[in-house]
Amino acid sequence: MAFISVDPNALLKALPYTGDGVAYGSGGNAVTGVGFQPDFTWIKSATTSEEHVITDSVRGVTKTIKPNSTAAEYTSSEGLNVFGADGFTVGSSDQFNTNTETYASWSFKGGTTSGIATNGSTTITPSAYSFNQSAGFSII
């Protein structure tokens, strides 16, 4: 049996950061040290009861969902605004970047957006997706 070696640090990074309250239009708060460009980031304040927030590259930056809420997806120009080569940049929204507040973030590396093979009878064609077969992680 062949074993596949997967480095979990290349696929998932938990990273605490401190908010600075800077609005995205003024540069925002660049959180670096992830080690890869994230495709999915989950953020939660570690110091207040703010809701959890998730942003992903398929839905698009500024599109946010709250997994611990019944609220629908919403758009925030002051939420997560950029997935960069080594992290992400957030604006001044309370759930992402209140000055001096501590946040926990979990960033996941997605994968490619091409190469989905079908058997010819597939009736669903996603408009956007990201999948990483070796990590067993997909965003559809």
Feature locations, PLM:
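Surface-exposed molecular-recognition determinants
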Residues: 1-140
